């Protein structure tokens, strides 16, 4: 009995150390950013981390309250653990182009690596930096760890890349706001006036959609005028190649509309000029495309007629962690989800653990699974199809911003997820 009591006490102490509510920012952190750069490399079955550099940057744009992640989102996560007290003092989940590439046919034949950057507040004392990956069974496994000594003179303290920046919207304090750094990609020096106007327009598109609209006064919007030699991104399928600051390209993973950059080093070098919670790469083109990867970045074409719809859809991926709800053959990934595991995204389910998804939001008396018929249009139910899979995966409504460009608003389930992320980020 005494041993049991001791064990219970030890478990309670350990749980307290991991409690996000117990972490005081000023005790553990400076109001600066610790940036860890590395390569994520491997193939369809393996992943490895290759450390590249560690930097101390001028601005911390994130919250000073919600320091430990409470969502459990992302195919990867990083943690910062205070060495002396063994307290978990910061953590976040994230996604990566590397993880998406692992689900392509090419990953079965060769190895690749993708640049990755994690940012967190700069620790006052020695801390252990840990990267975990989520395996096929949905369980996090340690991938890499490294001791961060804030006195280490190999931690770079370089001046940020010389890029003109301006605050176009918002008056809030960085730690209590959602700071979005819009990075210019494919804009020449002569096109910077257009870039600033494009930022205001695209940001306006996102902030006109609920629940972002209701919290619009909690957003700070920055424009970073990173100059490219050429105008527009690469379009490999048309043999068009441009010299741009972030080397953005259509046809990522041979999907024509997938418009991305792999140059996260330069992207973060540019963004370091301002405090930021999320980076939005605005790409100067009238061709349809974009991308959004959770806690990685959001990108969007500036001038396509559907850029309004694409901007909010991709921001749903990048900032909130929402899944795609479509299930046609227009993507290049294979078996992206294990149907025996509940996906981490809040707006799709395999029914393995539906209780923690939108079960409480189901329309009273609705049939489950819910037929995709006119009778159930606009109702919250359990509709088969989502996450690129037509069978075994379910989504909340027949149509949503995360499924097609036909909807002006997110569905109730996605709106709830968006609001949770907004409130977490602003420290509420």
Where are these regions (language model features)?
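Active-site-proximal segments of metallohydrolase catalytic domains
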Residues: 218-294
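Fold-level signature of zinc-dependent metallopeptidase catalytic domains
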Residues: 154-210, 223-233, 252
């Amino acid at each position: 009995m005494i041993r049991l009591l001791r064990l219970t006490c030890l478990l309670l102490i350990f749980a307290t150390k991991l409690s996000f509510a117990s972490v005081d920012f000023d005790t553990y952190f400076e109001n600066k950013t610790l940036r860890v750069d590395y390569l994520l490399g491997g193939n369809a079955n393996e992943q490895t981390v290759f450390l590249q550099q560690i930097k101390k940057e001028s601005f911390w744009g994130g919250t000073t309250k919600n320091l430990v992640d409470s969502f459990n989102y992302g195919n990867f996560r990083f943690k910062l653990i205070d060495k002396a007290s063994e307290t978990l003092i910061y953590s976040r989940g994230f996604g990566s182009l590397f993880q998406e590439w692992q689900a392509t046919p090419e990953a079965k034949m060769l190895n690749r690596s993708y640049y990755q950057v994690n940012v967190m507040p700069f620790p006052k004392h020695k801390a252990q930096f840990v990267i975990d990956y989520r395996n096929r069974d949905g369980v996090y496994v340690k991938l890499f760890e490294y001791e961060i000594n804030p006195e280490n003179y190999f931690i770079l303290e370089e001046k940020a890349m010389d890029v003109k920046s301006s605050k176009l919207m918002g008056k809030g304090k960085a730690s209590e706001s959602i700071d979005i750094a819009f990075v210019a990609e494919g804009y020449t020096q002569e096109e910077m006036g257009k870039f600033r106007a494009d930022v205001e327009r695209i940001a306006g598109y996102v902030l006109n959609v609920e629940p972002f609209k209701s919290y619009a006064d909690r957003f700070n919007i920055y424009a970073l005028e990173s100059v490219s030699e050429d105008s527009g991104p690469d379009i490999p399928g048309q043999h068009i190649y441009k010299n741009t600051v972030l080397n953005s390209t259509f046809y990522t993973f041979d999907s024509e509309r997938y418009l991305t950059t792999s140059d996260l080093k330069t992207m973060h070098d540019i963004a370091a000029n301002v405090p930021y919670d999320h980076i939005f790469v605005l790409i100067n083109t009238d061709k349809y495309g974009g991308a959004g990867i959770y806690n990685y970045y959001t990108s969007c074409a500036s001038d396509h007629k559907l850029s309004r719809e694409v901007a909010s859809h991709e921001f749903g991926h990048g900032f909130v962690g929402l899944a795609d709800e479509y299930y046609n053959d227009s993507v290049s990934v294979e078996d992206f989800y294990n149907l025996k595991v509940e996906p981490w995204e809040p707006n799709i389910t395999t029914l393995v653990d539906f209780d923690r998804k939108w079960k409480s939001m189901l329309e009273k008396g609705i049939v489950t699974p819910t037929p995709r018929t006119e009778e159930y249009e606009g109702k919250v139910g359990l509709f088969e199809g989502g996450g690129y899979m037509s069978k075994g995966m379910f989504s909340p409504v027949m149509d949503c911003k995360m499924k097609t460009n036909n909807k002006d608003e997110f569905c109730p389930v996605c709106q709830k997820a968006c609001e949770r992320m907004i409130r977490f980020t602003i420290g509420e």
